[in-house]
A protein has these predicted regions:
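Glycine-rich, proline-tolerant flexible connector loops at the mouths of alpha/beta enzymes
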Residues: 64-83, 140-144, 148
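Acidic (Asp/Glu)-rich catalytic clusters
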Residues: 28-29, 52-57, 74-95, 119-129, ...
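Hydrophobic faces of well-ordered beta-strands that scaffold small-molecule active sites
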Residues: 32-38, 63-65, 93-97, 133-135, ...
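Histidine-acidic metal/acid-base catalytic patches
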Residues: 4-16, 27-33, 49-50, 56, ...
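Active-site acidic/histidine proton-transfer and metal-coordination neighborhood
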Residues: 85-92, 104-201
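Active-site beta-loop-alpha junctions enriched in small/polar residues
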Residues: 39-41, 66-70, 98-101, 138-140, ...
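C-terminal segment of N-terminal export signals and the immediately downstream linker at the start
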Residues: 20-46
Length: 350
């Protein structure tokens, strides 16, 4: 890849082709970049090569390593071996990491300055042939900290500015996820514009909007111009006495309009990877009828909130989630992920 190549959403497909792996359609009616966010099956005890084998077993074209732990470390030679193994089997690889914000609760300051840590992941992405590095700011915690959300955003943007030249030299797009309650779509979109949409994009996660009292479609409408990869997740929401109960479910078993989300995602973001992510043991009570809930959400537009609440009004109360042992969790993850693959393929074929 040429020095200082800027990757935008429209050029991600070309970057994949440059790896030498065909971007032709995969199994059946799959989009050519349908695959798996490996966080879905993180408890299996697999190494990077076994994750590739899992993709081959299910005729998946793309996998995304969530972080260095999932990959098995950031040693350059290891990344080269994983790329070679994946290339031989026709599997495309994307790389991920955690926070890129030095003030976020997810950053461990004992690691030292955050910039070198980020650059190690960028280098791993380059060696893996990943055109994107999935990253994030934080979580819902950053809405409630003494430091306002806007200050966390400023710290992240400063970090990005410091790294722009080095990252673009390596030809990697920094792809910020709307993650675990940190940003609504309307908040993340202007951040991409300010950072520079020629080298910073979005990993759209369709499950995380419910953690920010947002309809997944609303988030998609805001973020579509910037999406370079995606986590396809389903959710179920229902109204409660104090607000809304929300949980992630097996894809196809939710009530938040994923058929329409998938249709719009494919239409408006044709070059983005569609990566199934399955998490089914998380529950959140969003007590939106209590005034103290709204700290950190003061600027949410009423019309957008009501689109979210309308989804909850159509839901029915669900039974409590089971408490699982470590072994049961591993089985549950694999079973639910595999069922999600079956379900999303039915939707592709519809």
């Amino acid at each position: 890849m040429n020095r200082r190549t800027f990757l935008t959403a429209s050029s991600v497909a070309a970057a994949y082709s440059a790896t030498g792996v065909s971007t032709a359609s995969g199994a059946g009616n799959d989009p050519s970049r349908f695959g798996l966010d490996l966080w879905s099956v993180r408890s299996q005890g697999w190494n990077a090569f076994q994750y590739v084998d899992h993709a081959v077993e299910h005729s998946l074209k793309v996998i995304q390593f969530a972080d260095a732990n999932t990959l098995g470390g950031l040693h350059p030679e290891h990344a080269r071996k994983v790329k070679a193994y994946a290339d031989e089997r026709g599997v495309l690889v994307e790389m991920g990491m955690g926070t890129i914000c030095p003030t976020a609760s997810g950053w461990n300051a004992s690691k030292g300055p955050i910039e070198p840590w980020i650059l190690r992941h960028v280098e791993a992405a380059r060696l893996l042939g990943s055109p994107v590095l999935r990253c994030l700011m934080g979580s819902a915690k950053e809405r409630k900290t003494e430091l306002p959300l806007e200050k966390h955003t400023e710290a992240m943007l400063k970090t990005l500015r410091n790294l722009r030249s080095q990252v673009t030299d390596m030809g990697v797009v920094m792809a910020i996820e709307n993650h675990s309650g940190d940003y609504q779509g309307r908040e993340l979109a202007p951040i991409i514009e300010e950072a520079g949409k020629d080298w910073v994009g979005v990993v759209y996660d369709s499950g995380n909007p419910i953690w920010t009292i947002e309809d997944p479609m609303v988030a998609l409408e805001h973020l579509a111009p910037y999406i370079v990869s995606s986590h396809l997740r389903d959710s179920y929401v229902w109204a409660t006495e104090e607000g809304v109960a929300a949980r992630w479910v097996v894809f196809g078993e939710g009530n938040v309009g994923m058929k329409d989300v998938l249709r719009v995602l494919l239409e408006r973001c044709p070059n983005a990877s569609i990566l199934l992510e399955t998490i089914t043991v998380r529950h959140n009570d969003l007590k939106v009828k209590r005034s103290d809930f709204w700290k950190g959400y003061e600027n949410v537009p009423a019309n957008e909130f009501m689109r979210f609440y309308a989804l909850a009004e159509k839901g029915n109360p669900q039974p409590p989630l089971p408490k699982l042992t470590k072994e049961e969790m591993a089985v549950r993850q694999l079973t639910d992920s595999n069922q999600g693959i079956v379900n999303v393929r039915k939707m592709f074929a519809a």
